[in-house]
Amino acid sequence: MDTQTLNFNKVHFVTSAPDIRHLPNDGGVEIAFAGRSNAGKSSALNTLTKHKNLARTSKTPGRTQLINLFELEPGKRLVDLPGYGYAQVPLEMKLKWQKSLAEYLQRRESLKGLVILMDIRHPLKDTDMNMLEWSSHRKLPVMLLLTKADKLSPGPRNNQVIKVRQAVAELGPQIQVEAFSSLTQIGVEKLAQTLTGWYLAGADDMTDGEQAPLEE
């Protein structure tokens, strides 16, 4: 299956949860999508799965307030995490989202890979770097998608990818940086191939009896 990818359009919605205590049992392999509230996270999920309305998109950043779980097949799930970094919401709500996000990232043993999305024109904000540094500490594989790549012509686009790759290189080889566009399909096949590899590797880990370590 090295040259094949999973059929992501077979995905179906499982549940929405305000925190990890309301999620299904912590087993199988989960790959989570995270990003700032205007990074195009929902659009990327919809494009990957070829489902127009799988993840709700909105012109209002910060619409995703819950942890949303989708299943590809038994034991293989996609997770749409609450967006971070949006200032124009009440402080109490922002803190609630941050706690929910942190708990999932730190305690969910079935989390085997993280897709972090950033607008290619405004990458590597402080909150993005915090996510990358945490992932590096946990040795979690990361695919960093520079979204809205269609907004730049090929030359500047490629330069931005190179610049970001250089900036995150010190965090380790487990971070893969790619341009992505839901509109023009740039990077969609690479995303599908990478996620397929993570799912298969995670399933192998479970077969071998290995578990991801819990963080403090």
UniProtKB/Swiss-Prot annotation:
CDD domains: YihA_EngB. Belongs to the TRAFAC class TrmE-Era-EngA-EngB-Septin-like GTPase superfamily. EngB GTPase family. Keywords: Cell cycle, Cell division, GTP-binding, Magnesium, Metal-binding, Nucleotide-binding, Septation. Its cofactor is Mg(2+). GTP binds at residues 35-42, 62-66, 80-83, 147-150, 180-182. Mg(2+) binds at S42, T64. Residues 27-201 form the EngB-type G domain. GO terms for cellular component: cytosol. Necessary for normal cell division and for the maintenance of normal septation. PROSITE patterns: G_ENGB (PS51706). The keyword Kinase does not apply. It comes from the Bacteria. GO terms for biological process: division septum assembly. The keyword rRNA-binding does not apply. This is Probable GTP-binding protein EngB. GO terms for molecular function: GTP binding; metal ion binding. Coiled coil: none annotated. Gene3D superfamilies: P-loop containing nucleotide triphosphate hydrolases. It comes from Aeromonas hydrophila subsp. hydrophila (strain ATCC 7966 / DSM 30187 / BCRC 13018 / CCUG 14551 / JCM 1027 / KCTC 2358 / NCIMB 9240 / NCTC 8049).
